[in-house]
A protein has these predicted regions:
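N-terminal targeting leaders
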Residues: 2-11, 25-215
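Bacterial N-terminal signal peptides
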Residues: 13-24
């Protein structure tokens, strides 16, 4: 059975692969390297390569629908997707815009759940954006280098100081640790978790091995 040290090495390798992917993306050879790195990262996740690919398709289709409906919606909202579970967060000025965004999020094949965390507000401007960017960067780093967290199975996003968590936890202890790490990041106001356990029946059976579409 793999040890924690092995898992930690795999997570760090996945993180380095993401960094190499970003650096290599500007060259023709980088396309090949990037594809291999992406596949390596996806293979390390609970959802597997197929699950990650399905989620990527869902993301593209929702973003396309938002842009087509109203570009303002696209730039105001955030998407987190894991195994077909879609979390929509951000701020829009009216309820009608929020309703349309959620409706569009349900449309792609493979979407199994849409979690609506949209706030009706004009938004906080550049200060909130800068603060959220710092929170996201700090939280990503803290999770990546924590030896007791399989960070690759989590999606995190800060909106106006609120951190939203999505993904799959190995157990309750790991999720509690992720929650504490997020809460302790400077300027985080609250943490909202939509993470499910590895053995949760809502998960797709064998997501990395050709289960139901939805990733």
């Amino acid at each position: 059975m793999p040890t924690k040290a092995v898992f930690r090495t795999a997570r760090l390798g996945a993180g380095l692969a993401v960094g190499l992917l970003a650096l290599a993306a500007c060259t023709p050879a980088g396309v090949v390297v990037g594809g291999a790195a992406s596949a390596g990262v996806a293979a390390s996740e609970e959802r597997g390569i197929k699950g990650a690919a399905d989620d990527a398709v869902i993301r593209v289709k929702i973003n396309e629908a938002w842009v087509k409906e109203d570009f303002d919606t696209f730039i105001r909202l955030n998407l987190q997707i894991y195994e077909g579970r879609v979390l929509v967060s951000g701020r829009v000025p009216d309820q009608a815009q929020a309703d349309k965004a959620v409706q569009a999020a349900w449309q792609p094949d493979g979407v199994r759940e849409v979690i609506n965390e949209i706030e009706i507000s004009e938004g906080g401007g550049l200060n909130d954006f800068a603060n959220d960017t710092l929170i996201n960067a700090r939280l990503d780093a803290d999770l990546l280098f924590d030896g007791d967290v399989d960070s690759i199975n989590y999606s995190t996003r800060a909106v106006a100081g609120t951190v939203y968590l999505l993904g799959v936890a190995q157990d309750r202890a790991e999720l509690d640790r992720v929650f504490r790490i997020a809460r302790d990041v400077p300027n985080v106001k609250r943490v909202i978790s939509h993470v499910i356990m590895k053995d949760d029946p809502r998960r797709i059976a064998n997501p990395g091995n050709g289960g139901n579409s939805g990733g």
